[in-house]
Regions:
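Short loop/turn elements at secondary-structure junctions
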Residues: 75-143
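Conserved short "hinge" loops at termini or chain/domain junctions
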Residues: 1-65, 122-143
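Ordered, amphipathic secondary-structure segments that act as subunit-interaction surfaces
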Residues: 48, 52, 64-84
Length: 143
């Protein structure tokens, strides 16, 4: 489940701007595939950053995550089209800083409880045992 949609992108930029950023075939319409690729890339970044603290993908999508996903997607679309991202660079930097704070447990996501990653569960920890060494420094002293 994507954290943002094309409609979320259109809440932040005009349809004409989104067409300019996605329409490589000059069809005059939003290229949904290009928009979805940018959203998927943004969601992958978000998942990678918050996975040490939260189980991903998130089931309930907090507003902050939806905003970050849309902001990162718009920024990536600007880079995709080699267009100066302008103010979106600052918004991208702020979103990444927030996600970094979430990863460092300095910020939390509303309505979502932090869950330790599966590797932190010590109930399934492995234990290894071995026979005593046949040859050691003390046994081989004098040879």
């Amino acid at each position: 489940m994507a954290y943002s949609t094309t409609a979320d992108l259109l809440e932040r930029i005009s349809e004409a701007s989104l067409i300019q950023l996605t329409d490589t075939a000059n069809s005059g319409a939003v290229n949904q595939t290009a928009a979805q690729h940018a959203i998927d890339a943004a969601d992958g970044i978000i998942d990678a950053l918050i996975s040490p603290v939260y189980r991903v993908p998130l089931t309930g999508i907090p507003r902050a995550v939806r905003d970050a996903s849309a902001t990162i997607a718009i920024y990536r679309l600007h880079l995709y089209r080699s267009v100066d991202p302008g103010v979106w660079k600052d918004a991208y930097t702020a979103s990444m800083a927030f996600l970094g704070a979430v990863a460092e447990k300095k910020a939390t996501l509303e309505g979502t409880l932090p869950e330790p990653p599966a590797s932190a569960n010590l109930d399934n920890a492995l234990s290894y045992t071995a026979e005593p060494r046949n040859f050691s420094r003390t046994l081989l002293t004098g040879f």
